[in-house]
Regions:
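Post-His helix in hydrolase/transferase enzymes
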Residues: 243-259
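Flexible "cap/lid" loop of the alpha/beta hydrolase fold
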Residues: 94-145, 183-187
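Active-site loop/oxyanion-hole signature of alpha/beta-hydrolase fold enzymes
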Residues: 35-37, 41-78, 91-99, 117-126
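Gly/Ala-rich beta-loop-alpha elbow adjacent to hydrolase catalytic centers
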Residues: 80-85, 89
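Conserved HGGG/HGGXW glycine-rich cap/lid loop of the alpha/beta-hydrolase fold
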Residues: 2-48, 66-70, 74-75
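Conserved serine/cysteine hydrolase catalytic core
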Residues: 165-170, 174-243, 261
Length: 262
């Protein structure tokens, strides 16, 4: 990997995962001398909260917001969101634009001032062919929308980890936790992104061409066209879990992005 300026990377996981999913990338980046912070969102990884405790995106995103708030005023980070983590980092961009060097969306949801969370959810659902063994929980009754979900071994193997080492898939089957699902009214509460704040942060999108979860043409390219970032990178032969299937290529990509926008 190219030597040069050292950066502080903040890595945010996607749905049902946790800080644990970054272990390969963290090791590579730290070996290059970079500072890396990895966070568990609420009710994720080893965070002590339970999914039933979460009533809004703000509740789920609290660990990231607290972390960003705790940074010294002069410190700026490279904020990286994977999959659903793109929503988390978007909310942080709106509140802390001055603390972010560049935001990197890794085969991720990328809302914007003219593309709200509900529109993303609808587009995502249109490209889902089967939920397979994903388990949905209906704490408000079967006649209402599900309140959480957790991915099962089959959908993880087929759609998330199909090009990743089998031991990483095994790890995931033991460590995934339910992620909260919110109805449209909650999704639209306190989640507005402005051109003045969110819009002033430079954005890079990393496309994974073999992603079976957020498919390249049906979702990733749709996002890029509807909310154009400053730059787009492609990692070839990467499944949804690029940090497992292509950890070195992905880490090199992050360093290259960070040095360009430093």
């Amino acid at each position: 990997m190219e030597k040069g300026n050292k950066n502080h990377f903040v890595l945010v996981h996607g749905a049902c995962h946790g800080a644990w999913c970054w272990y390969k990338v963290v090791t590579i980046l730290r070996s290059e001398g970079h500072k890396v912070s990895v966070l568990d969102m609420a009710a994720s990884g080893i965070n002590p909260k339970h999914v039933e405790d979460l009533n809004s995106m703000a509740d789920y995103n609290e660990p990231l917001m607290e972390f960003m708030n705790s940074l010294p005023q002069q410190e700026r980070v490279v904020l990286v969101g994977h999959s659903m983590g793109g929503i988390n980092i978007s909310l942080a961009m709106e509140k802390f634009p001055h603390k972010i060097v560049v935001a990197v969306f890794v085969t991720a949801f990328m809302p914007g001032p003219d593309l709200n969370f509900v529109a993303l959810s609808q587009q995502y659902n249109q490209q889902v062919e089967s939920h397979m063994d994903t388990e949905f929980v209906y704490n408000n009754g079967l006649e209402k929308c599900p309140t959480s979900l957790v991915f099962g071994p089959k959908v993880l193997a087929t759609n998330f980890y199909q090009l990743s080492p089998p031991e990483d898939l095994t790890l995931a089957t033991y460590l995934v936790r339910p992620v909260p699902l919110f109805d449209e009214s909650i999704l639209l509460t306190n989640t507005t992104l402005s051109k003045e704040k969110y819009g002033c942060v430079r954005r890079v999108y990393v496309v994974c061409d073999k992603d079976n979860v957020l498919k390249e043409e049906q979702f990733q390219r749709w996002l890029i066209n509807n909310n154009p970032p400053n730059e787009v990178h492609m990692i070839h032969d990467a499944d949804h879990m690029v940090m497992f299937s292509k950890p070195r290529e992905f880490s090199s990509c992050l360093v290259m992005i960070s040095q360009k926008y430093h």
